[in-house]
Amino acid sequence: MDRIVEIEKADFEEEIETSLRPTSFDDYIGQSKIKENLKVFIAAAKKRAECLDHVLFYGPPGLGKTTLAHIIANEMGVSIKITAAPMIEKSGDLAAILTNLEENDVLFIDEIHRLSSAIEEVLYSAMEDFRLDIIIGSGPAAQTIKIDIPKFTLIGATTRAGMISAPLRDRFGMQFRLNFYTSDELAKIVQIAAVKLNKECEKNAALQIAKRSRGTPRIALRLLKRIRDFAEVNNENIINENRAKSSLDALGVNDLGFDEMDLKYLEILGSTKNRALGLSTISAALSEDEGTIEDVIEPYLLANGYIERTAKGRIITAKSCEILGIKYKMTQKGLFDEDQ
């Protein structure tokens, strides 16, 4: 099901997202602690004339992991090569990428948790010793060829840090979790992006967009672009609060950033009242795969207290019951009483 608040990036958005992407830490809104630490580490690496240590970014999709990788490369004054783990199928694929890097370049691997164990084995020596150990042949006749490669910085990005093997994770000298953005931060991002899209967006309008963006810049920018379309058709050069509200309502995004899929998810949990639901059950009810539910739908709901995840499954909270108009009553066991 296509969703206007879908966090995953579609191919057609790549070009316009690049044009809206900040190119320096000074232009990057949010994630203040991460920015300040990275500034120090980059300055130290440049002072020593070394490549930056390897970096792992993790957290929900759409929060700026790729953007930060680009900024790191810009601040270091080096090139960045971008790939995704599913595209690295054989050790030869990785070898081709690494041998084509220049000294101190940045290699960005998205979805790094999806690397196979065989590829990880090759990556270990590359990360630690800047050397490739390639095994040729098999059995007693197998030989290991050692190839020196340029020193480089690996930046890995993942939405599932728990799925990264411990040996790979431990080789990242810097590990940062990206958090959801505040409404004020998102409003600033929206207003800056609106100017780049040749529109003026009033502050109250930007806040309306921010409130419905699930703490995620990618969603905020997608909503802004759709609202711009409504304004364009109505010959409006300025996006005001009324335009933002009416457009968002037309798009089916409510004041909490929920769309039909979120509400259906909560209604499924609310209908059980006195028992938790497992992921497979929710997946079947929503006709969505489990990975999409875990990576896209649930993070925002969990972070904001709309659901809880227990050993027995997912349960609805009082906060969500109030939204749905469902009676919430806890038993001594900590579950919900059924209406009598």
Swiss-Prot record:
Ranges for the region named Small ATPAse domain (RuvB-S) are 182-252
Q: Which SMART domains match?
A: AAA
What's the top EC group for this one? hydrolase
The entry marks the following residues as binding Mg(2+), namely: T66
Q: Which residues cross the membrane?
A: none
Q: Name one GO cellular component term.
A: cytoplasm
Q: Where is this region: Large ATPase domain (RuvB-L)?
A: 1-181
**Chain positions recorded as ATP binding sites:** L20, R21, G62, K65, T66, T67, E128, D129, F130, R171, Y181, R218
Pfam families given in the database record: AAA_lid_4 (PF17864), RuvB_C (PF05491), RuvB_N (PF05496)
- Which EC number(s) does UniProt give? 3.6.4.-
Chain positions recorded as DNA binding sites: R309, R314
- InterPro entries reported for this sequence: AAA+_ATPase, AAA_lid_4, DNA_helicase_Holl-junc_RuvB, P-loop_NTPase, RuvB-like_N, RuvB_C, WH-like_DNA-bd_sf, WH_DNA-bd_sf
Q: Where is this region: Head domain (RuvB-H)?
A: 255-340
Q: Which UniProt keywords apply?
A: ATP-binding, Cytoplasm, DNA damage, DNA recombination, DNA repair, DNA-binding, Hydrolase, Nucleotide-binding
So what does this thing catalyse? ATP + H2O = ADP + phosphate + H(+)
Q: Which SUPFAM superfamilies match?
A: P-loop containing nucleoside triphosphate hydrolases, Winged helix' DNA-binding domain
Q: Which CDD domains match?
A: AAA
The entry describes its oligomerization and partners as: Homohexamer. Forms an RuvA(8)-RuvB(12)-Holliday junction (HJ) complex. HJ DNA is sandwiched between 2 RuvA tetramers; dsDNA enters through RuvA and exits via RuvB. An RuvB hexamer assembles on each DNA strand where it exits the tetramer. Each RuvB hexamer is contacted by two RuvA subunits (via domain III) on 2 adjacent RuvB subunits; this complex drives branch migration. In the full resolvosome a probable DNA-RuvA(4)-RuvB(12)-RuvC(2) complex forms which resolves the HJ.
**Matching NCBIfam families, A to Z?**
PRK00080.1, ruvB
Function field: The RuvA-RuvB-RuvC complex processes Holliday junction (HJ) DNA during genetic recombination and DNA repair, while the RuvA-RuvB complex plays an important role in the rescue of blocked DNA replication forks via replication fork reversal (RFR). RuvA specifically binds to HJ cruciform DNA, conferring on it an open structure. The RuvB hexamer acts as an ATP-dependent pump, pulling dsDNA into and through the RuvAB complex. RuvB forms 2 homohexamers on either side of HJ DNA bound by 1 or 2 RuvA tetramers; 4 subunits per hexamer contact DNA at a time.
Family recorded in the similarity comment? Belongs to the RuvB family.
* Record's comment describing the protein's domains: Has 3 domains, the large (RuvB-L) and small ATPase (RuvB-S) domains and the C-terminal head (RuvB-H) domain. The head domain binds DNA, while the ATPase domains jointly bind ATP, ADP or are empty depending on the state of the subunit in the translocation cycle. During a single DNA translocation step the structure of each domain remains the same, but their relative positions change.
Official protein name in the record: Holliday junction branch migration complex subunit RuvB
Which organism is the protein's source?
Answer: Campylobacter hominis (strain ATCC BAA-381 / DSM 21671 / CCUG 45161 / LMG 19568 / NCTC 13146 / CH001A)
Q: What is the lineage of its organism?
A: Bacteria, Pseudomonadati, Campylobacterota, Epsilonproteobacteria, Campylobacterales
